[in-house]
A protein has these predicted regions:
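Conserved glycine-/histidine-rich ATP-lid loop and adjacent helix of the Bergerat-fold HATPase_c
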Residues: 106-121
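Conserved ATP-binding N-box helix of the HATPase_c
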Residues: 22-52, 110-112
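C-terminal end segment of the histidine kinase catalytic
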Residues: 127-158
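Conserved catalytic segment of the transmitter module in two-component histidine kinases
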Residues: 15-23
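Conserved transmitter core of two-component histidine kinases
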Residues: 2-15
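Short beta-strand element(s) in the Bergerat
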Residues: 5-7, 61-67, 131
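Glycine-rich/acidic phosphate-handling loop/turn and adjacent ATP-lid/helix
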Residues: 56-108, 146-148
């Protein structure tokens, strides 16, 4: 990622630790959103990454993680960016697209979250007054456990 902006991480789950395939999915989705934010955001405004968990009735070993990446843009680019994001989120894609071109950007996040969660969890919440675009996705991820000194398995997962 070519970083131009300061990135601020916040939220109740920002220090939580996870393991398993969910970490790779999380990384891929977050990478796309941060890369796009750095590319299109105003250089004088920080990019905000808010990380929270939602109540999860499925398993105590899984967190339902919700990540929102918010960036500000200039008024001459805002409405075009908002429209392009909306079109990409609403567009349907054929599975053959993944084979022939590989997904990138919003298509990649939609594919990853749909494969993991059963449907795409990507959404955009624009704030026209502040010229902010907030993109959110949710994933279930396995909570990392740390084993005690007495345990047979001394690994720590981060």
């Amino acid at each position: 990622i070519n970083r131009n902006n300061k990135v601020e991480f916040l939220g109740s789950a920002v220090d939580n630790k996870y393991t398993g395939i969910g970490v790779h999915r999380l990384y891929d989705c977050l990478h796309v959103l941060l890369q796009n934010a750095h590319k299109h955001a105003r250089s004088d405004c920080p990019i905000l990454v808010n990380v929270v968990t939602e109540a999860n009735a499925i398993s105590s070993q899984l967190d339902s993680l919700q990540i929102t990446v918010t960036s500000s843009t200039t008024d001459d680019k805002y409405f075009d960016q908002k429209q392009r994001i909306h079109q990409a989120i609403c567009a349907s894609e054929a599975g053959i697209d993944m084979v022939t071109e590989g997904y990138s950007g919003i298509k990649k996040i939609k594919f990853i979250t749909r494969a993991s969660e059963g449907l795409s969890t990507l959404s955009c919440n624009p704030n026209d007054d502040a010229l902010e675009l907030a993109l959110t996705f949710s994933l279930h991820v396995e909570v990392a456990s740390e084993f005690s000194e007495k345990g047979a398995d001394q690994r720590k997962y981060y």
